[in-house]
Amino acid sequence: MKQTLILAFLALASVAQAQIRQERNLDKWQFSRDGKDWQQVDVPHDWAITGPFDRKWDIQHLAIEQDGQTEAIDHTGRSGALPWIGKGEYRTTFRLSAGTKHTTLYFDGAMSEPVVYVNGREAGRWMYGYNAFRLDISPYVKSGVNEVRVLLNNQEESSRWYPGAGLYRPVTLITAGDARIDPWATIFKTVNLAGSKAQVYVETQATTPKGKGATRVAIKLLDANGRAVAQKNLAVNAQGMVAAQLNIANAKAWSPEQPYLYTLEVSLYQGNKLADRLRQRVGIRTVAVSKEHGFQLNGQSRKFKGVCLHHDLGPLGAAVNKAAIIRQIRLMKDMGVDAIRTSHNMPSQMQMQVCDSMGMMVMAESFDAWKEPKVKNGYNLFYDQWWRKDLENLIRGHRNHPSIVLWSIGNEIPEQWNKEGAQRAKDMTDYCHQLDNTRPVTCGGDNPKANT
C-alpha cells in the first residue's frame, strides 16, 4: 500500500511538472531529397551548401530594370550555383507525457514553403521562408511518441541571392498547461528615460481556464545579477490581459557602447500555484526621429555607421550558427560599425539576441519585393494573402529586442513609382505602427523621386 501511494505521488508530480512551460530544441532529424534515401542531420541544416556547384542552379532569365535592361537575358552568379532549388523532406519524433495540455511547434524559419505534418495529419503551412511561425499542434498529438514531417519546396528563380535550403533555423517544441502566457503578446517598452530614472510599460496576455481559482500575474524586472529592480502583482482581467507600469530608480540604458540587458520575468499563478513562467531579455532605451534632431537613441542624436548584412554565413551556408554570428558582429564592431540592415529579409532570433547582447542597432527588414516581381517566383506570388501575416509574426516575435530600432517594409520596390506602390507602403506602415508604436518604419528605396 505504501509503495502504491509513493508511485501515485510520483505520477501526480510528473503530471504537475508537465503543466509548466518547457521548451525543447528539436535538433535531430532525418532528411531526404526524394523521400527514399534518408540521412541523419542536425538542425539548423542547409541542404544545399555541400554542393555540388553547377551553373544550372543559377540561371535566371530576366531583364533587370534597375540596371537599365529592357530585354530579358540569362543571368548567372546571383544565387551561388548551389543546389537549393527543388524539394526536400525532414522527419523526427518526440515524446509527450500524459499530463501535457498544450503543445506548440515554433519554426524560426524554413526555406521554403513549409508544410508540417504531425502524426500523418497536416498541422499547418507557411509560405515565406524567412519568417518565423507557430503551430498549435495540440489536436494532433498523443501521449508517447509523435512524428513530425516537414515538406519544403524552393521554386526556381525565387531569389536574387543564395537563400539556403531546408530547416536552416531552429525548431522548438513548447509544452505548457491549460493556463499559460503568450510570449508574442508580451510587450516591454520604455515609456520615459530621464537620466537614471526610467518608466517601462509591460503588457501580457494569458489563457486562463474558468473554474480553477483566481489568476494573477507577477511581473519582475531583474538586473544583470538577477536582482529585482521593479515588480508588481496584478489580477488577470476577464479578457486575460494584464498591463503595468514599472518605475526603475537606477536604470541602465541600452546602447551600442553599453548594451545593458535586463530580464523580464512574467509568472502566471492560479491561486498560489505557479502555472506558467516566461523570461525574456530586454533593454531600456528610447528611439525617436524628427526633422530637427534626426535619429535619436536615448535622447542623443546620432548617425548610423551601418552595413547591409545578408543572412548567410559564407562557406557555412544559411544554417544559423551562434559562434559565426558573434564573429560577424565582432568584426563589424572592430571596424566601427554600430548598425546592420537585415538585407533584405526577416532576421533570426539568434541573430537579434547576439545584436542585443553585443550592442548592434538593427533595421529589421521584411521583403525584397511586394506585388510586382523582381524574379519570376518571388514574394509577389504570396503578397496579397500573406503580407499582413508576415509583418505580424515579424513584429510580434521581435518587438522586445532593444537592438531593433527601425522596421523596414521593403527594398528597392518596383512599384515605388506608381500610386499602387504608395498605397501599399501606407497600408504596411500603418499596420506596423498598429503592432508597435515605438519604432519608425522605413523602406529602402533606390530613387528619391519615387512616389513611396
List where the protein language model places each region:
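Beta-strand-rich binding/interaction modules
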Residues: 116-118, 197-235, 244
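Hydrophobic h-region of N-terminal signal peptides that target proteins for export
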Residues: 9-17
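Accessory beta-strand-rich segments of carbohydrate-active enzymes
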Residues: 23, 29-32, 80-183, 209, ...
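Surface beta-strand/loop "capping" patches
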Residues: 178-210
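Substrate-binding/catalytic cleft of secreted carbohydrate-active enzymes
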Residues: 329-330, 339-452
